[in-house]
């Protein structure tokens, strides 16, 4: 090793797995608070499942001939016991697994919601990441179209609560298993007539999962997909009644929708209702929420036959929309930044900061960055940059007199002028600050 210190290489995060920095966290917190309030209003309960599950859960639940299972899962073998494990690419299968394992449905249906990171090994691009976050709902034990309509209505309420516009609803019905089987026969016959122009993905799916060919993103295959036999034409009376019942409920609640016969979703567990909320404001990644009915899944994963429906939405995509439409709320600063000069003042200021926190105020106490006392000027700069409404100042004079200086940093305070310092007795400091903040809020409402 040379005399000169060897340069230590900086480590970067994994591509497609992003840090959420403090300047962005406020928007996440705003969205999370808004959606949690909505979920409570609909009687949903939070469930939290592990990030890692047995790989078999997803191959059996999602379907082996799907993009997620074939190409996108982060799977590995546990070195301790040889188990095949996967970082969850979605969470419906995990919630259903938990409901079965813990016998959650023994006393009736459940409304559950989750939020957290998912993982898919795909090419990172705008709105599509290797680690991404979803919030979702699962209504377990509800069979009627009213449950489908309710979860769709929840999405519309969320867009309204967030102030988002231009998100459009598309719906379809995948019918029942026997109806899909009859459609599959005709669809394969049709696709075989065009096999020469099918791309490799379509050829691979032709006999394993032909329905997914209709969802192709290949521009060269759009006309073929458009003219293919439509599953909706194969629906029996029961499926048709369910789909028409959903449409009536949506219309009764003034929810506009488009029937998209090519909407099939990328997961094998869906039946009957499927839907997507789409926008043209995010480029190619236009789907912000999607879901539907998955009545066969609970039985497929070892439970008793139980109807179910749900949705998931990509949080990153919704936050992109909030920024795009300039709906991101301003970051709120703390209430108070405590400044001090001198050892005795530091101790008094530290005690005062804790007493202010006791009353529920948000307080930053100035701590030295390098162990040396900072100048009054630099501390006040920090106070202003923090977004605090007030600076509370302790110096030798304040300590000697049992007082504190208070400066309004945001035009608040009894004098109504920014940076007008007032002297306040320490015992009356909390009351003074609360009254000043109330007065400032009232002025802001005028």
From Swiss-Prot:
The gene is hisS. It is found in: Cytoplasm. CDD domains: HisRS-like_core (cd00773), HisRS_anticodon (cd00859). It is an enzyme of class 6 (ligase). Its EC number is 6.1.1.21. Keywords: Aminoacyl-tRNA synthetase, ATP-binding, Cytoplasm, Ligase, Nucleotide-binding, Protein biosynthesis. This is Histidine--tRNA ligase. The keyword Membrane does not apply. Belongs to the class-II aminoacyl-tRNA synthetase family.
């Amino acid at each position: 090793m040379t005399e000169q210190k060897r340069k230590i290489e900086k480590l970067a995060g994994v591509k497609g797995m992003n840090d959420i920095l403090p300047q962005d966290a406020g928007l996440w917190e705003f969205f999370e608070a808004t959606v949690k309030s909505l979920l409570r209003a609909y009687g949903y309960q939070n469930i939290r499942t592990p990030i890692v599950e047995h790989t078999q859960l997803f191959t059996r639940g999602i379907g082996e001939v799907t993009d997620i299972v074939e190409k996108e899962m982060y799977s590995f073998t546990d070195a301790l016991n040889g188990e095949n494990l996967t970082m969850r690419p979605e969470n419906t299968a995990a919630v259903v697994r938990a409901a079965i394992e813990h016998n959650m449905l023994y006393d009736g249906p459940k409304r559950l919601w989750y939020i957290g990171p998912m993982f898919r090994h795909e090419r990172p691009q705008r709105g599509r990441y290797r680690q991404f976050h979803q919030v979702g709902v699962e209504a377990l034990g509800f069979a009627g179209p009213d449950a489908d309509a309710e979860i769709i209505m929840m999405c519309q309420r969320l867009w309204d609560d967030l102030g988002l516009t231009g998100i459009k609803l598309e719906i379809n019905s995948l019918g029942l298993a026997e109806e899909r089987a009859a459609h599959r026969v005709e669809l394969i016959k049709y696709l075989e007539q065009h096999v020469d122009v099918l791309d490799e993905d379509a050829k691979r799916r032709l006999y394993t999962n032909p329905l997914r060919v209709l969802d192709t993103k290949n521009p060269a295959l759009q006309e073929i997909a458009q003219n293919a036999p439509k599953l909706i034409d194969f629906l029996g009376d029961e499926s048709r009644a369910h789909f028409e019942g959903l449409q009536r409920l949506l219309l009764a609640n003034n929810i506009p929708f488009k029937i998209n016969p090519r909407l099939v979703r990328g997961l094998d567990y869906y039946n009957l209702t499927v839907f997507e909320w789409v926008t043209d404001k995010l480029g190619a990644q236009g789907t912000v929420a999607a879901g539907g009915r998955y009545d066969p899944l609970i039985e497929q994963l070892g439970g008793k036959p139980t109807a179910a429906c749900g949705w998931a939405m990509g949080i990153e995509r919704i936050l992109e929309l909030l920024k795009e439409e300039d709906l991101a709320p301003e970051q709120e600063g703390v209430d108070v930044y405590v400044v001090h000069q001198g050892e005795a003042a530091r101790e008094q200021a530290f005690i005062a900061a804790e007493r202010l926190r006791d009353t529920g105020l948000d307080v930053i106490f100035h701590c030295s960055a390098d162990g040396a006392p900072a100048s009054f000027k630099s501390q006040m700069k920090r106070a202003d940059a923090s977004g605090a409404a007030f600076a509370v100042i302790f110096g030798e004079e304040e300590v000697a007199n049992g007082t504190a200086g208070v400066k309004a940093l945001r035009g608040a305070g009894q004098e109504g002028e920014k940076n007008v310092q007032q002297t306040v007795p320490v015992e009356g400091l909390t009351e003074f600050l609360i009254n000043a903040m109330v007065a400032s809020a009232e002025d802001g409402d005028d």
